[in-house]
C-alpha cells in the first residue's frame, strides 16, 4: 500500500513538474495574445490633436482639431508639404499662387478667401491661431494644393485622429506585401501586445531607416499605424514613388519664339530714338534690348522711371523687343521689407506691369543683385506673383 502511494505521489510530482516546465516554456516561447487598444497605444495624443502621416510616415508635429475641422501647422505645411504658401506675419496675410487659378489670399479668423478680386467661402474658419502657432484647415489646404499634394483622408473620432497625405512624388519608399496573415505588434518581438490583425497580401510600408530586430521589421500600414511584423512575411519588396491624383500645375512664361540675343542699354537719363540708333548700329544679331529704366527708390514698392515711348517705338520699328530693367542698387532699400510685405509686394508688381503696358514694353527684366538669404523666401514669392500677372498681360518676364 505504501509503495502504491509512493508511486502515485511520484506521478503527481512528475505531472506537476511537467506542467510547471510547460508553463515556463509556454511563457517563454508563446506569443502575446493581448490586443492593445488604439486609445492606449496613442494615449499621449491629446483629444484635440491629430497625427500627421506624410508620404507614409508619421511626423513629430501634430495637427489640431477645432470643432469638426482638422488643422495642420502652417510652418510644417510650408516646410514639408507645399512651399507655394507664403505667410506674411507682419500684415497677417497668407498667399498661395496657382499658375492656373492665380493669386489667392486669406487672413486669420475668417471663412472667406480671395481669388483675384473674387471672394470665395469655406465652411469652416481657414486659419486658426493658437499662441505662436498658425494652423491651416485641412479642407482649405486640400482645395489649394490638390494638384501639388494628395490628401488621402482625414479621420476624426477614430483613434488615433490622423491626416494621411502625400506631397513628395519624386522620392521612393519601400512597399511590401504580407506573405501570411499576421499581427502588427507594438514592439520587435512576438511577446509584445498586438494592435491589428493583418491579412495575407496586405500592403505595408517598410521603414528602411530601422534594422530588423529579433527577426521583426518596423512597418507602417497605409492608414498610418506603426508597428512590427515578422521580417520573413515581407514579400515582393519594391521601391516605388507616390502617384499624383492629378497633373501638377506648372508655371509657364511667354517667350519670343526664337533664341534671345539681349543687350542692356545703360542709362542715367531719358533718351530717345537717336541714342538707340547709335547703340544698335553695331549690335549684329541683337533682337532684345533692355534699357535700365527702373530703380527701386524706397521701401514702399515704388520705383523711379526713365521710360520713353519714343524709344520703344523706335526699337519696335527696328524689329527689337524691349524689356525694361528694374534694379535694386539703392543702398537705402530693403528687399526683405519690400518683397516680404504683401501690400508693398503687390504695389511693386502692379506698378511694374501697368508701366510696362503703358509704354508698350514686351517684357520686364529683374536685376535684383542684393538678395540676402533672409529675403530669398519673399523674392521667390514675388517672382511667382509677378509671373502670373505678366503672363496674363502678355509680357515676358526675365
Map each language-model feature to its residues.
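A short, Lys/Arg-enriched amphipathic alpha-helix followed by its capping loop at the start of a domain
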Residues: 279-286
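Short, solvent-exposed loop/turn elements at domain surfaces
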Residues: 185-187, 269-275, 297-300
Amino acid at each position: 500500500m505504501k509503495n502504491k502511494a509512493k508511486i502515485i505521489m511520484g506521478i503527481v510530482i512528475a505531472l506537476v513538474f511537467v506542467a510547471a516546465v510547460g508553463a515556463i516554456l509556454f511563457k517563454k516561447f508563446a506569443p502575446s495574445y493581448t490586443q492593445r487598444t488604439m486609445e492606449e497605444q496613442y494615449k499621449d495624443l491629446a483629444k484635440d490633436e491629430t497625427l500627421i502621416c506624410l508620404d507614409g510616415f508619421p511626423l513629430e508635429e501634430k495637427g489640431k482639431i477645432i470643432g469638426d475641422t482638422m488643422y495642420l501647422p502652417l510652418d510644417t505645411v510650408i516646410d514639408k508639404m507645399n512651399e507655394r504658401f507664403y505667410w506674411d506675419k507682419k500684415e497677417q496675410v497668407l498667399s498661395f499662387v496657382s499658375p492656373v487659378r492665380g493669386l489667392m489670399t486669406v487672413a486669420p479668423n475668417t471663412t472667406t478667401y480671395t481669388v483675384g478680386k473674387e471672394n470665395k467661402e469655406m465652411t469652416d474658419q481657414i486659419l486658426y491661431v493658437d499662441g505662436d502657432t498658425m494652423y491651416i484647415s485641412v479642407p482649405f489646404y486640400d482645395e489649394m494644393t490638390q494638384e501639388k499634394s494628395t490628401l488621402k483622408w482625414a479621420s476624426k473620432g477614430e483613434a488615433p485622429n490622423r491626416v494621411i497625405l502625400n506631397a513628395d512624388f519624386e522620392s521612393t519608399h519601400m512597399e511590401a506585401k504580407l506573405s501570411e496573415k499576421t499581427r502588427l505588434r507594438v514592439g520587435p518581438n512576438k511577446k509584445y501586445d498586438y494592435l491589428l490583425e493583418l491579412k495575407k497580401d496586405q500592403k505595408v510600408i517598410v521603414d528602411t531607416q530601422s534594422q530588423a530586430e529579433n527577426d521583426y521589421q518596423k512597418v507602417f500600414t497605409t492608414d498610418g499605424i506603426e508597428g512590427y511584423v515578422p521580417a520573413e512575411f515581407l514579400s515582393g519588396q519594391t521601391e516605388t514613388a507616390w502617384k499624383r491624383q492629378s497633373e501638377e500645375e506648372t508655371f509657364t512664361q511667354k517667350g519670343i519664339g526664337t533664341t534671345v540675343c539681349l543687350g542692356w542699354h545703360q542709362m542715367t537719363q531719358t533718351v530717345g530714338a537717336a541714342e538707340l540708333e547709335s547703340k544698335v548700329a553695331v549690335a549684329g544679331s541683337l533682337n532684345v534690348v533692355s534699357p535700365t529704366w527702373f530703380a527701386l527708390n524706397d521701401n514702399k514698392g515704388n520705383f523711379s522711371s526713365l521710360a520713353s515711348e519714343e524709344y520703344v517705338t523706335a526699337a519696335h520699328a527696328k524689329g527689337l523687343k524691349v524689356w525694361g530693367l528694374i534694379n535694386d542698387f539703392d543702398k537705402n532699400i530693403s528687399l526683405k521689407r519690400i518683397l516680404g510685405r504683401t501690400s508693398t509686394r503687390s504695389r511693386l508688381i502692379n506698378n511694374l506691369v501697368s508701366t510696362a503696358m503703358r509704354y508698350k514694353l514686351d517684357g520686364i527684366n529683374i536685376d535684383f543683385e542684393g538678395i540676402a538669404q533672409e529675403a530669398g523666401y519673399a523674392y521667390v514669392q514675388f517672382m511667382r506673383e509677378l509671373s502670373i500677372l505678366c503672363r496674363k498681360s502678355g509680357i515676358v518676364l526675365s
